[in-house]
Curated annotation (Swiss-Prot):
The active site is at C50 (nucleophile). This is Glutamyl-tRNA reductase. Its EC number is 1.2.1.70. Pfam families: GlutR_dimer, GlutR_N, Shikimate_DH. Possesses an unusual extended V-shaped dimeric structure with each monomer consisting of three distinct domains arranged along a curved 'spinal' alpha-helix. The N-terminal catalytic domain specifically recognizes the glutamate moiety of the substrate. The second domain is the NADPH-binding domain, and the third C-terminal domain is responsible for dimerization. During catalysis, the active site Cys acts as a nucleophile attacking the alpha-carbonyl group of tRNA-bound glutamate with the formation of a thioester intermediate between enzyme and glutamate, and the concomitant release of tRNA(Glu). The thioester intermediate is finally reduced by direct hydride transfer from NADPH, to form the product GSA. The gene is hemA. It comes from Rubrobacter xylanophilus (strain DSM 9941 / JCM 11954 / NBRC 16129 / PRD-1). The record marks H98 as: Important for activity.
Length: 429
């Protein structure tokens, strides 16, 4: 059995590669259903955000990499060769460590950002809803979420952290010198847009207009911050009015095209500043070649992030120290997973003997209900103490790669075939 992650992130590939393998929620569900039907991949979780697409699996053998990347390439309509070039592949302890680092935001573009923990939780929830998880990934993702929460609570890694929307607003401020009195157009009304509007308001933007495919959502977001809703159908006019345009719809097609930007610039004297934080991108890259238009995509934000990374180095180091023992603990559990049926067999066998012998003894005694319960408790305690050592030995041997079969355990560890002890209770005469 193999735990593995095949992934592509801002660390391994540029945005133009990442957007080709990004999944909308409905597409993610469809891909999980397809994986569920694949032989040799009993468990899978798909994590797709603006900065990463990662597939976590439990597979039967190392060749799973070829199969998984082939399925991913076919589903996304990309060349398998490009996936091999741009993806990373981690297995077993390194796959576990990677997920823990992702959940703790150590692998994020913005170290300490808060969104990733919720995104990991949502990805795991979707996989469970699609019946794609089992004992291994259930435990892995539960522990990953606990690690992420602990890191945030105990290291302060999220204190004064910069979310992607925060960085976008900061970059706009650096370009204009000040955002006081500026007009902003925000495309999209999701969580990223809400965070972005908040940061723009905090920096003094005078007018914010919000456009979304669903006008009602744009109106709700605008009402929260004293902005105004706009229609995407009026985009040419809205572009001409705005100083700053930030887009985060991730619709999968160009929301802002070159001719629209060129037309908007003809009716104004000042330049137009555009930030595209969507993956897939919303703004046609040809806009970069238009005089007076300044376009930044999500990869361009990395420079701003790096200037603010030093403040979080100490917290990140503390987080890494938490992750190491957590990886060891998970791998120790995993190494004993294959002997769980054996341990259950031993416990069940001992419990059958206990019940039989206690029942036989109680029939010969005249005890009150309280006294009978005391005998039951005593017998359970004796059995648990007798089994503790052998079960610990089984787990230790399994962890060392030396699992014992059922017969050998009975003979060498439990000695259940000793004088006067029967593995299966005899019938009463």
């Amino acid at each position: 059995m193999l735990i593995a992650v095949a992934g592509m992130s801002h660390r391994s590939a540029p945005v133009e590669a990442r957007e080709r393998v990004a999944f909308a929620p409905c597409a993610a569900r469809s891909f999980l259903r397809r994986l569920r039907e694949e032989d040799g991949v009993p468990e899978a979780v798909l994590l797709s955000t603006c900065n990463r697409t990662e597939l976590y699996v439990v597979a039967e053998a190392e060749p799973a990499r070829d199969r998984l990347l082939g399925l991913l390439a076919e589903d996304r309509g990309v060349e398998p060769g490009s996936l091999y070039r741009d993806t990373y592949w981690h297995t077993d302890a390194e796959a576990v460590r990677h997920l823990y680092r992702v959940s703790a935001s150590l692998d994020s573009m913005v170290v300490g950002e808060a969104q990733i923990l919720g995104q990991v939780r949502d990805a795991y929830r979707m996989a469970t809803e699609e019946r794609c998880t089992g004992p291994v990934l259930n435990r892995l993702f539960h522990t990953a979420l606990r690690v992420g929460k602990r890191v945030r609570a105990e290291t302060g890694i999220g204190d004064s952290s910069l979310s992607v929307p925060h960085v976008a607003a900061k970059l706009a401020g650096e370009v204009f010198g000040s955002l006081e009195g500026r007009r902003a157009l925000v495309l999209g009304a999701g969580e990223m847009s809400e965070l972005l509007v908040r940061h723009l308001r905090d920096r003094g933007v005078a007018e914010i207009r919000i456009a979304n495919r669903t006008r009602e959502r744009a109106e709700r977001l605008a009402a929260l911050f004293g902005g105004r809703a706009a229609d995407l159908g009026d985009l040419p006019r809205e572009l001409a009015r705005a100083d700053i345009v930030v887009s985060s719809t991730g619709s999968g097609e160009w929301v802002i095209r070159g001719p629209e930007v060129a037309a908007a610039l003809e009716s104004r004297e000042e330049p137009l500043f555009l930030i595209d934080i969507a993956v897939p991108r919303d703004v046609d890259p040809v806009v970069q070649s238009i005089e007076g238009a300044f376009l930044y995509d999500i990869d361009d934000l990395q420079a701003v992030v790096e200037r603010n990374a030093e403040d979080r180095q100490e917290a990140a180091a503390a987080a890494e120290e938490m992750i190491g023992p957590a990886v060891v603990e998970f791998m120790s559990w995993l190494s004993t997973l294959h002997v769980a049926p054996l341990i259950k067999e031993l416990r069940d066998g001992a419990e059958r003997i206990r019940r039989h012998e206690v029942s036989r003894a109680l029939r010969k005694m005249d005890l009150s209900p309280e006294q009978e319960e005391a005998v039951e408790r005593m017998s359970r305690s004796i059995v648990n103490k007798l089994l503790h050592g052998p079960i610990s030995e089984i787990k230790a041997r399994a962890g060392a790669g030396d699992p014992l079969d059922s017969a050998e355990v009975r003979r060498r560890l439990l000695s259940l075939r000793g004088p006067g002890v029967e593995l299966h209770p005899s019938r009463e005469p």
